[in-house]
Amino acid sequence: IAHTTFFDVQPDPTLKNAQDGAKQMAAFQPDTIIALGGGSAMDAGKIMWVLYEHPEANFMDMAMRFMDIRKRVYTFPTMGEKAYFIAIPTSAGTGSEVTPFAVITDGETGVKYPLADYQLLPNMAIIDADYHMSAPKGLTAASGIDAVSHAVEAYASIMATDYTDGLGLEALKNIFKYLPRAYENGQNDVEAREKMANAATMAGMAFANAFLGVCHSMAHKLGAFHHLPHGVANALLLEEVIRFNSSEVPTKMGTFSQYDHPHTMARYAEIADYLKLGGKTDEEKVENLIKAINELKDKVGIKKTIKDYGIDEKDFLDRLDAMTEQAFDDQCTGANPRYPLMSEIKQMYLNAYYGRHFVETEKPSAAQLKKTEKKSNKKA
């Protein structure tokens, strides 16, 4: 079998990175593309696939935001006309092997774009724990917590269904049970690696259909601005987002008709019930869920704050406004059950940096709400 290998994929792949891979594909003319690696390799592989099959495709058109992936203004090019795409993950977290998403960074602007279209769904995914056995502890931890955030956000999404709920809950049960084992003895514990591989893929199937939320919007930009691993960025922000979304009287709700009243606290409480975390009221159950997530992070060596990762305070504050605006504009924000104001995103970033908890501030004025809504409509 004639083959060639492109192995220069960066941890946060850039558009230039994908273009280089597409050039190699154009020279070789493959009829099968195999993306073997973690989320970066699979995401970059998807973009290479697009540029190989459709070199005329415009990146900014593909990155255009939309309200519903099935009813978008831009028609994504039809994939599979030249090559069959196979994804083989070597880490348990991203779920990219079963999702219609690819995250890529514009190297010129530094903006990280989550591209989304069902044409990006791989033709085949091969889940084999043998490829995971040598993953180092840091990667195992970051990837595992990333999968937690996928399952939690999919369950809280305004587009969640019975199908995505089952996948998300079962993924979480297995992650809480097997991630510490995979972290501590991953080179020898085949069962833990296999269960984590399956859990990450199930979480991927959940958010492939229910989508994500503002935790990922913020994590995309935190990672792009300060070069934190994606899973770590999600881990640092997830508690803040759970508290933010749990408000019974949000400043602004999500935008889909099926989400007709605030009930995200009850949804998080259902996760706590499934994991048998205890609690008599929804408030207690949410606190127990947050506690369990924090204990899991401690077990796998995730630090508590953004500051703990050596991010300079002045640099963080200097870039906070730009990071906040880009997070607000991120594609993932639209499926969040509570539509955030930019001031609220900024506060969550600050809390995650200093290790504080999100609390409701004074209700914004009508003028502030109108300004945020106007900006949201303009960007959409």
Residue ranges and their predicted role:
Residues 159-167, 183-195, 210-215, 253, ...:
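Flexible, glycine/charged-enriched surface loops at secondary-structure junctions
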Residues 225, 232-315, 358-359, 363-368:
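Gly/Pro-rich interdomain helix-loop hinge
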Residues 98-210:
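Carboxylate- and glycine-rich phosphate/diphosphate-binding segment that chelates Mg2+/Mn2+
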Residues 5-15:
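Short beta->alpha junction loops
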